[in-house]
A protein has these predicted regions:
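N-terminal, active-site-proximal structural segment of metallo-dependent hydrolase catalytic domains
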Residues: 2-11, 17-80, 93-102, 156, ...
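Extracellular/periplasmic catalytic domains that process cell-envelope and extracellular macromolecules
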Residues: 23-25, 57-58, 81, 98-101, ...
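His/acidic metal-ligating clusters that form di-metal
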Residues: 142-159, 171-212
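Metal-dependent phosphoester-hydrolase catalytic domains
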Residues: 186-196, 203-284
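Sec-exported extracytoplasmic/periplasmic mature domains
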Residues: 59, 77-85, 113, 184-191, ...
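Catalytic metal-binding/acid-base residues of hydrolase active sites
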Residues: 36, 70, 162-164, 201-204, ...
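Structured beta-strand-rich core segments of catalytic domains in phosphoester-bond hydrolases
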Residues: 63-157, 161-163, 254-260
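Short, solvent-exposed loop/turn segments at secondary-structure boundaries
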Residues: 42-46, 133-134, 169-174
Length: 284
């Protein structure tokens, strides 16, 4: 009888060990940050001081999803760690608008060397405001759809975006169309894998109409708002979001999330937005 129990126990342990060999876990630390990167003439701080610090701090993260990397990219990228891979979004200066800037999107990766990264840049087809409504039409805002393939040949997707600002009805109408653009693109690509969508959506958490847009967007793509019940310092307006969806092959579990309060100098924060972070346990 004892021998029979021993054999059953040994078999059970062996099965579990065999199963665990096929489950790989990885913790990813993700930064989402609008860097306030307008040209110096439009801001009242010192971007030449701020951006090298922000660039260095991206080395603390596996994935950094950056918005407003407009006028200070040279200072910003000068302090990336040597192994970082980075991809900028759609650039400006076209024949139709030679003085327009690019999307300001930059995604930075410090992932395992054997992982693959593919980036698809897309510009929004609408904007609101040339001389009013936050002047969004002077930037080719858009989004990046990033396909990440792990060493086990399993995929998950990340979207980095910066949407139309401003509080007018026309600004909100543009945001609605931009959200629909993301939904359409995700569906067109038939993305059924795990999905992370993050960035400056310019959807104010205290604006009921903006929140209706966010809820519809979440429902359309089956997303969960990671920061819904996480308190951020009251000095910030909540415009930035991290939304996730589980996949069939990869499971995303939240380890921790919040504001990285180290993004400051002795005088002030490094931007006019909070630095949001998310630690994810990825099981494949």
């Amino acid at each position: 009888m004892d021998l029979k129990k021993l054999l059953i126990c040994t078999l059970f342990i062996s099965i579990n060990l065999f199963s665990n060999e096929h489950v790989k876990e990885e913790i990813l630390k993700i930064l989402v940050y609008n860097t306030h990167g307008l040209p110096e003439i439009f801001i009242d701080d010192d971007p030449k001081m701020r951006f090298p610090i922000i660039g260095r701090k991206t080395g603390e993260y596996d994935i950094s999803l950056i918005q407003e990397d407009y006028a200070h990219h040279e200072e910003f990228s000068s302090n990336f760690i040597k192994e970082s891979k980075f991809f900028r979004g759609p650039m400006g200066g076209t024949l139709l608008c030679p003085f327009c800037t690019g999307s300001g999107l930059t995604s930075i990766f410090n992932l395992p060397q054997e992982w693959k990264i593919e980036v698809d840049n897309e510009a929004y087809q609408t904007c609101s405001g040339w001389l009013r409504g936050a002047n969004d039409c002077f930037a080719y805002k858009g989004f990046q759809i990033i396909k990440i393939t792990t060493s086990k040949n399993k995929n998950f997707f990340v979207v980095n975006t910066h949407m139309d600002a401003g509080r007018r009805d026309s600004d909100r109408a543009s945001r609605k169309i931009q959200l629909e653009h993301i939904v359409s693109k995700v569906n067109k690509k038939r993305i059924n894998d795990a999905l992370i969508i993050a960035g400056d959506l310019n959807l104010n958490s205290k604006d009921a109409e903006d929140m209706k847009l966010l809820e519809k967007f979440k429902n359309d793509l089956g997303l969960t708002d990671i920061f819904k019940d996480i308190k951020i310092d009251e000095k910030w307006s909540i415009l930035d979001y991290i939304l996730i969806r589980q996949g069939k092959e990869i499971n995303l579990s939240v380890v921790s999330a919040g504001e990285d309060e180290s993004f400051v100098t002795e005088e002030s924060p490094l931007s006019d937005h909070p630095a949001l972070f998310l630690e994810l346990l990825i099981k494949e």
